[in-house]
């Protein structure tokens, strides 16, 4: 069997196709979660905290001789900063995404349990039992 034929068989197997679909849907779903976090949740959190832009939250670790206040300006000047705002946004994003995936998996597991088990097929009668039945029936005659 040639390598191209093997690749075709691999590519059209269910697992490879399921993985491809999952990656595509996951990418689109990630954008939805980014929008929920960035456009809905973080503005509410920033309203409570008092900061509108979390990505601009940081601590200056080095000397700041020019008294720069913007994170981009500090980084451009080469001043050491501990930028935790972007991390907070990404952390909230991750927690929401993980919770949604958990709920989806939980629902899928519940649906699997609810499906009735297919009735087991009766196993084929062994040959020796068939032979014994045939002998018994012959003796009855």
UniProtKB/Swiss-Prot annotation:
The chain crosses the membrane at residues 21-41, 85-105. Coiled coil: none annotated. One of its GO terms (molecular function) is mechanosensitive monoatomic ion channel activity. One of its GO terms (cellular component) is plasma membrane. SUPFAM superfamilies: Gated mechanosensitive channel. It holds the Pfam family MscL. Gene3D superfamilies: Large-conductance mechanosensitive channel, MscL, domain 1. It is found in: Cell inner membrane. Keywords: Cell inner membrane, Cell membrane, Ion channel, Ion transport, Membrane, Transmembrane, Transmembrane helix, Transport. It is a multi-pass membrane protein. InterPro entries: MS_channel, MSC/AndL, MscL_channel. HAMAP family: MscL. Channel that opens in response to stretch forces in the membrane lipid bilayer. May participate in the regulation of osmotic pressure changes within the cell. Belongs to the MscL family. NCBIfam families: mscL (TIGR00220), PRK00567.1-4 (NF001843), PRK13952.1 (NF010557). Homopentamer. This is Large-conductance mechanosensitive channel. It comes from Dechloromonas aromatica (strain RCB). The lineage of its organism: Bacteria, Pseudomonadati, Pseudomonadota, Betaproteobacteria, Rhodocyclales.
